[in-house]
Amino acid sequence: MKLLIISDIHGSSYYAKMIPEIFKLEKADEIIILGDLYYHGPRNPLPKDYSPMDVCNILNSLKEKLKVVRGNCDALVDETISDFNFHDHLLLTINNKRIYFTHGDKYNQDVLPDEKFDIMFYGHFHTGFIRKKNNLIFANPGSLSLPKNNTRHSYIIMDSEKITLKDISGS
């Protein structure tokens, strides 16, 4: 199982259009989005080519391969235009590893959920990283459209062997 993990699109159709291309290029099996799909939020600037409905159409076209975790900028009304479900979190077992997916505003490496896991993926902070802490792996794909702290537009690929943080150029 190969996963494409992205977060924090914030309504940018420019970067959302890259998702199907990255999915195909990486030969991923599924896409997991860690929230903040359509709205840019009051603290963020408008992202490039801001068009929440275009982002929705792109994501709806990928619905068969898509799992989505709700972010702090995602509203209940967003679910009415989306052909996929928004989950509060996901807990999947892949390759005998329990993997917890969340947005990051509630649970992250500093505030752990009650559920036991081996790997936690979360977004929210717009800063990509992969780190180990107390025998657990924490990974953040950064933001596809609005990276912060001098980081790049990025995503994560997870396969049976490793977790890799990549910028949108694929490096």
What do these predicted regions represent?
Residues 2, 91-95, 132-134, 138-171:
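Binuclear metal-dependent phosphoesterase catalytic core
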Residues 6, 102, 140-141:
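Thr-Gly-centered strand-to-loop micro-motif
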Residues 4, 32, 67-69, 119-121, ...:
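Hydrophobic/aromatic beta-strand patches that form the interior of the parallel beta-sheet core
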Residues 2-94:
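Core catalytic region of metal-dependent phosphoesterases/phosphodiesterases
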Residues 10-17, 39-41, 72-79, 106-111, ...:
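Active-site environment of divalent metal-dependent phosphoester hydrolases
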Residues 82-129:
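Internal catalytic-core helix/loop-beta-alpha segment
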Residues 51-66, 122-128, 141-158, 167:
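A broadly tuned preference for mixed-charge, low-complexity surface segments
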